[in-house]
Amino acid sequence: MVVTALAFDFTNGFHDTGNAMATSIATGALKPKVAVGLSAALNLVGAFLSVEVAATVAKGIVNLDKVNIGPGDGKNHMLLLIVFCGLVGGILWNLLTWLFGLPSSSSHALFGGLIGAALISLGKDGVVWGGVVGKIIIPAVLAPIVAGIVSAIATALVYLITRKVEHEKQIKGFRWGQILSASLISLSHGTNDAQKTMGVIFLALVAYGRVNPEDGIPVWVKICCALAIALGTYIGGWRVIRTLGKGLVEIESPQGMAAEMATASVILTSSHFGLALSTTHVATGSILGTGLGRKNAEVRWGVAGRMVIAWIITLPAAAIVGALTYLLGHYIGLYNEVLGVIVVFIILVIAASYIFYRSLKTPVNANNVNDDWDDHKSSKDSRASKLSTCLLYTSPSP
């Protein structure tokens, strides 16, 4: 269970590296490998700064009052299976959207998986709907809008204030500023996203009877989650970095700094209040805002539209995966509880291996991440469009 949770944390790290470093890489403020190394180090530090979001995940999604702790050793196999299948849903969605370079929300993939598994096992009362709506869905809608507005205003002010500065000096100066602003995003990403995995592991520990629901997050959990997300970040999710850095808006350094400062401020504020924001949503909103704030900037609304479609279907798609894997694990588990988990884990490994194999056919790495978007746009956009269309037609009607 802990290994699977840390695997999710790892995919979260490399999937969401683009949130922090895409604009700095796109403008040349940081070399690609230096950028992901810096981001990894700061994600590691950020994971230790707060636990408010971890509390939201641990106690604000699955209704622990509806789960009866088992007798004897206190192990609750139902809760363990809910958590495990939620993680499987989150990991598979992360890998699938990474393959297509779609900056979807790792957080919502995890939440969707947990919600689906909880619904199928405990019914509608098994989900804390107040927490889901108040601390997940509403912030998901408002955060990119707020970030976009802040970023657009900041971009307009930056160009207004520096309008008399020579263009080359302006670009050079803001590149240095981007190093600071990108670092703040990485720090804020650690404070927000690593905590989500901490919350999941905490749920597993509750199921095992190792901790009480009222206890705090153990130190060893914080350390493991911090290391996993840092390692994933260092590996670098180049496909998503490319989409955010080159696919939405052609970004100059002043825009990059404005977008990054807007992203960092929104995420850090939300972490303080325990809001489980998607850093992907915030970063994307900020980047779009820079396109609106700079005169004559080109915004690729087609790419943005496909991202929004992926955002909308992330929760239900991951919930379906979580629910189906729970059913599979549960019914096999009627004969042998461990066997059910093993079968689901094998399916996860096979699916992940296939996705990785597919990614080798169209490699994106530090050497080509900054290539002009038009060089690959038609093939990449068509794949992303097919994914979005397929998922729309396979998602259940409300």
PLM feature segments, named:
Residues 1-389:
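Multi-pass alpha-helical transmembrane bundle typical of ion/small-solute transporters
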Residues 393-398:
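Conserved small/polar residues in nucleotide/adenosyl-binding loops
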